[in-house]
From Swiss-Prot:
Pfam families: MIR. This is Stromal cell-derived factor 2-like protein 1. Residues 33-87, 95-150, 151-205 form the MIR domain. SUPFAM superfamilies: MIR domain (SSF82109). SMART domains: MIR. It comes from Mus musculus (Mouse). A motif (Prevents secretion from ER) lies at residues 218-221. Gene3D superfamilies: 2.80.10.50.
């Protein structure tokens, strides 16, 4: 049995800004050259399975019982926005490029929970469960993911991997799909090895520039 959370929704002001930008632009356009920066809000596409990292107020009916994380094919779902945050206080100054090898937190914008994994089996593939955990962006050390990429910084046009700091698994999708109440959404889980199932690319979003606030300093995708 899946469960629906009744917690307070986080980030309504930010969501409104994102939706306004989307309406004004008529949708997403091809990503321009640049780097992913700390504080940016974006969607992440699994490049092999063509689904975006997603979460919502629905809990797993097994395993940890925490908020579920899935992959969706739709590009315009507001529940697919994640904020890039530092692994520690002051560890990711706003607007600075994210370094390859840097540990970050990915915070789900609408619920304020962090991308998380732990030693529970995932519901469909029996890999490692990936969930969303915490309140208002505050969780624990199992929310940390290392950005694995080539070169010095995370480039918006490049494919990257996210390796969990605590358990070493890679954020992955292998194609399993759920039934009701989230029919058609793909399972997201952790896998022990780097492969084609765990490459991701930055897509739609707002990318913070050094010294800029969210309302004025963005590059729209």
């Amino acid at each position: 049995m899946w469960g629906a959370s009744r917690g307070r929704v986080a980030g309504p002001t930010l969501l409104g800004l994102l939706l306004a930008l989307s309406v004004r632009s008529g949708g997403a356009s091809k990503a321009s050259a640049g780097l992913v920066t700390c504080g940016s809000v974006l969607k992440l596409l699994n490049t092999h399975h063509k689904v975006r990292l997603h979460s919502h107020d629905i809990k797993y009916g097994s395993g940890s019982g925490q908020q579920s994380v899935t992959g969706v094919e739709e590009s315009d779902d507001a529940n697919s926005y994640w904020r890039i945050r530092g692994g520690s206080e002051g560890g990711c100054p706003r607007g600075l490029p994210v370094r390859c090898g840097q540990a970050v937190r990915l915070t789900h914008v609408l619920t304020g929970k962090n991308l998380h994994t732990h030693h529970f089996p995932s519901p469909l593939s029996n890999n490692q469960e990936v969930s969303a955990f915490g309140e208002d962006g505050e969780g624990d050390d199992l929310d940390l993911w290392t950005v694995r990429c080539s070169g010095q910084h995370w480039e918006r046009e490049a494919s990257v991997r996210f390796q969990h700091v605590g358990t070493s698994v890679f954020l992955s999708v292998t194609g399993e799909q759920y039934g009701n109440p989230i029919r058609g959404q793909h399972e997201v889980h952790g896998m022990p090895s780097a492969n084609a199932h765990n490459t991701w690319k930055a897509m739609e979003g707002i990318f913070i520039k050094p010294g800029a606030d969210l309302s004025t300093g963005h590059d729209e995708l």
